[in-house]
């Protein structure tokens, strides 16, 4: 087990190196002294960029051998060496004063949660059906069969295993298997747990100039101890990584709207592309985010937001072309696209809408799963809107609601019974909007506390 953990650590160091190169080009750090404070967002950038590149490499016929991964990560790391115009750091500077005792206590608590999360992941068996039959199965197939073998990834006997789902998570796990030198389906759970841990550490840095540090760390502690997230982060499923990438895409997109830094728009595009490469549900999620960004950006920057959305969607084209070339049913038999605009078909299923929506809201509000993240965020949205921070409040509420609407739409038009959907997916599909609300909770709390003492944050002209 120890050697496998070391191998996985080496693979993640490659991701970190890739992220360091891309992150430096985007202003996450400039000098070596800046890097330690930016490690968490840099790591997430590295996994996102490497995962997307790995998917493209598989489509191109590569097998993700160790030398190929090292070469690819080295190429991404070299991006940081390209001379670029320096306009300061994209990340807000850390607080100049030493943290107060309460902040240190919160940081220690978050650190303890991270350690426990990683330990739980390292010893957790491969017991989730979707992980065993879909996500880790595909990672094993990539490793054992030397890439995308059409006999499996386009094979009729495997059609019920969602062959059309994107490959970022299986690709990243396959890289982990390569560096382990073995297929350890237990240790590999650490990979998704690392992504969640990185999000918890990255959010306070991304919001350092917007919220008091104590509020930021208290909020991520609330996210980190949410029972449902702890369970999913080490289960080998794609829902937690999807939520991580989407939260980063939304936070970076909001920062671009508020501050006008193009680097944040590029980061939002990268993480949106990672969302698309992680799970099929990511497509409507990204569409919802881009729509809200286009509306919120204002006249002068709407074209940039549209361009960012188009760039993110373009990254998914190679995988879609591979599916089409190999005759894979991209609806997997669940979504009858020919019926989507059939009034008779839709009218006969209207009863699914209130039932599905109510079930999703019920799961999101469960204190035994998500504590008080959703109620706290809902109250903060209302108070922030009444206090003058309408732009931020509407941005967060609109993205979260549109994400839920996209899930309800899938429940409405999908062929499987509504009972099947609610029993097998409802508790997981709310992960993305709940983590989104948790990521913005410190911003909303600060906005709500201001009342009408200050003007709302307006984007630069």
Predicted regions and their residues:
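Membrane-interface helix-loop-helix junctions at transmembrane boundaries of multi-pass membrane enzymes
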Residues: 96-101, 208-215, 260-263, 297-307, ...
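Membrane-interface alpha helices of multi-pass inner-membrane proteins
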Residues: 219-220, 224, 252-253, 264-280, ...
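Transmembrane-helix motifs of polytopic, lipid-linked glycan transferases
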Residues: 77-86, 187-210, 248
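Transmembrane-helix signature of polytopic, membrane-embedded enzymes
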Residues: 33-41, 183-186, 203-225, 258
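Membrane-lumen/periplasm interface segments of specific transmembrane helices
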Residues: 124, 288, 295-382, 402-408
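Membrane-interface transmembrane helices that cradle and orient dolichyl/undecaprenyl
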Residues: 205, 249-264
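Membrane-embedded, hydrophobic transmembrane alpha-helices
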Residues: 1-95, 446
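Hydrophobic, aromatic-rich transmembrane alpha-helices
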Residues: 174, 196-207, 294, 359-362, ...
């Amino acid at each position: 087990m120890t050697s496998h953990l070391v191998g996985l650590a080496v693979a993640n160091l490659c991701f970190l190196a890739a992220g360091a190169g891309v992150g430096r080009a985007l202003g996450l750090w400039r000098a070596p002294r800046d890097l330690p404070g930016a490690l968490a967002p840099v790591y997430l950038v590295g996994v996102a960029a490497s995962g997307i590149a790995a998917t493209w490499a598989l489509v191109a016929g590569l097998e993700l051998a160790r030398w190929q991964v090292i070469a690819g990560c080295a190429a991404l790391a070299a991006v940081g060496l390209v001379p670029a115009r320096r306009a300061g750091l994209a990340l807000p500077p850390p607080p100049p004063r030493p943290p107060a005792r309460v902040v240190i206590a919160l940081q220690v608590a978050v650190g303890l949660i991270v350690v426990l999360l990683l330990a739980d992941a390292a010893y957790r068996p491969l017991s989730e059906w979707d992980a065993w039959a879909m996500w880790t199965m595909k990672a094993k197939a990539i490793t054992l069969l030397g890439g995308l073998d059409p006999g499996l990834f386009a094979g009729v006997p495997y059609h019920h295993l969602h062959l059309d789902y994107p490959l970022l998570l299986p690709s990243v796990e396959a890289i982990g298997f390569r560096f382990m030198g073995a297929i350890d389906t237990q240790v590999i759970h650490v990979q998704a747990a690392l992504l969640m841990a990185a999000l918890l550490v990255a959010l306070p840095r991304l919001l350092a100039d917007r919220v008091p540090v104590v509020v930021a760390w208290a909020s991520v502690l609330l996210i980190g101890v949410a029972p449902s997230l702890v369970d999913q982060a080490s289960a080998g499923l794609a829902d937690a990584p999807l939520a991580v990438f989407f939260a980063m895409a939304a936070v970076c997109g909001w920062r671009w709207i508020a501050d006008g830094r193009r680097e944040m728009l590029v980061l939002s595009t990268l993480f949106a592309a990672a969302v698309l490469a992680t799970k099929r549900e990511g497509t409507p999620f990204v569409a919802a985010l881009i729509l809200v960004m286009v509306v919120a950006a204002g006249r002068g920057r709407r074209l940039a937001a549209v361009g960012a959305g188009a760039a993110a969607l373009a990254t998914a084209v190679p995988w879609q072309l591979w599916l089409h070339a190999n005759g894979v049913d991209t609806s997997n038999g669940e979504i009858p696209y020919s019926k989507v605009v059939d009034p008779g078909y839709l009218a006969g299923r209207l009863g699914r809408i209130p039932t599905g929506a109510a079930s999703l809201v019920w799961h999101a509000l469960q204190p035994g799963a998500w504590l008080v993240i959703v109620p706290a965020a809902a109250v903060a949205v209302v108070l922030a809107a009444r206090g003058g921070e309408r732009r931020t409040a509407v941005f967060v509420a609109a993205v979260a609601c549109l994400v839920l609407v996209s899930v309800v739409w899938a429940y409405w038009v999908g062929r499987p019974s509504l009972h099947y959907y609610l029993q097998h997916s409802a508790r997981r599909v709310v992960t993305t909007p709940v983590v989104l609300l948790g990521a913005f909770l410190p911003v909303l709390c600060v906005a709500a506390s201001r009342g009408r003492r200050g003007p709302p944050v307006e984007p630069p002209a």
